[in-house]
Amino acid sequence: MGINSDVSRPRARSTPNMSKKFQTIGLIGKPHHQGTNQTIEKLHLWLTAQGYTVLVEERVSAELEIEFQAVDLVEIGERCDLAIVVGGDGNMLGAARVLARYDVAVIGVNRGNLGFLTDLPPDGFETQLAQVLGGEFETEHRFLLEAEVHRHGMIKASNTAVNEAVLHPGKIAHMIQFEVYIDEQFMYSQRADGMIVSTPTGSTAYSLSAGGAILTPNLQALILVPMFPHTLSCRPIVVDACSTIKLVVSPDNGENLEVSCDGHVHLSVLPGDEIIIRRSQQRLMLIHPKGHNYFHVLRNKLGWGSKLF
């Protein structure tokens, strides 16, 4: 049975122990997934045996058969030095949008499909994780997007995205009309099923499926990918990450639209609204085992050809 966290417990990180790079570790997982539960239990037992303080995210806590401290995702961000996300890239994205607000390192254990963001294997994670906990890791910062819906000069809704912000029809797929501005300069009008604005992190996700290029994570750039544009000449375009992108929805659109952030959060959009998408001040601090190679990940996940000689 789980032990809920004491509500009177101060939300502060542990007193530093100079012999350990990380002191308090949060475990986050894919809810209602047997494999994830097994991995979290193994991680919890392994980490506590080595003297770490371990917190478990409350959404997965009800299904575990060990004693633990159950807390919400915000408290993990406030109290932990390291968060381990067990699941697929979707679970990593959901956690990352919250954890990016805090100075907490994040690493993933892959219990999903491709797993571009989750480095550690669910079986035999101990060797690599021990090296990471011992200070042998590489740090990588990924920037986020901030998406805002403006209506009559006021911000009506906003959220952040690690992968992409997508303007699209609501419940029924159909063509929509909108104008695209980059740093207040008109680029073009579009008649399409929508527009994907992606970070380099998201360039191997929805953007890639829609025909966008892969951007290496260190690039300070965004890629705009029209979705099924009603023209033969429109192609994805890469712009500087410091650009402000404005999508102006035509008042002639007959139905309400949406902006999706990483496919998790949906912002309602009305005809005539303006969507402002820019680089967020928040950054996700990913850590990888030593020797992490992005092109090895691409080659492995996408089935690219191996060396010829």
From Swiss-Prot:
Asked whether the UniProt record includes Nucleotide-binding among its keywords, one would answer yes
A single Gene Ontology CC annotation of this entry is:
cytoplasm
What Pfam families does the annotation carry? NAD_kinase, NAD_kinase_C
Reactions listed under catalytic activity: NAD(+) + ATP = ADP + NADP(+) + H(+)
**Which segment of the chain is annotated as a signal peptide?**
none
Q: Where is the active site?
A: 89 (proton acceptor)
Q: Which cofactor does it need?
A: a divalent metal cation
Task: Indicate where this protein resides in the cell.
Answer: Cytoplasm
Q: What class of enzyme is it?
A: transferase
Q: Which of UniProt's keywords are assigned here?
A: ATP-binding, Cytoplasm, Kinase, NAD, NADP, Nucleotide-binding, Transferase
At the top level of its lineage, which domain of life is listed? Bacteria
> What EC identifiers does the entry list?
2.7.1.23
Q: Does the keyword Metal-binding apply?
A: no
Q: What is its main location?
A: cytoplasm
Molecular function GO labels: ATP binding; metal ion binding; NAD binding; NAD+ kinase activity
An example GO BP is: NAD metabolic process
Q: What NCBIfam families has UniProt attached to this entry?
A: PRK01231.1 (NF002306), PRK03378.1 (NF002893)
Q: Which PANTHER family match?
A: NAD KINASE
Per the entry, what this protein does is:
Involved in the regulation of the intracellular balance of NAD and NADP, and is a key enzyme in the biosynthesis of NADP. Catalyzes specifically the phosphorylation on 2'-hydroxyl of the adenosine moiety of NAD to yield NADP.
- Protein family according to the UniProt entry: Belongs to the NAD kinase family.
The protein, known as: NAD kinase
Q: Give the source species.
A: Shewanella denitrificans (strain OS217 / ATCC BAA-1090 / DSM 15013)
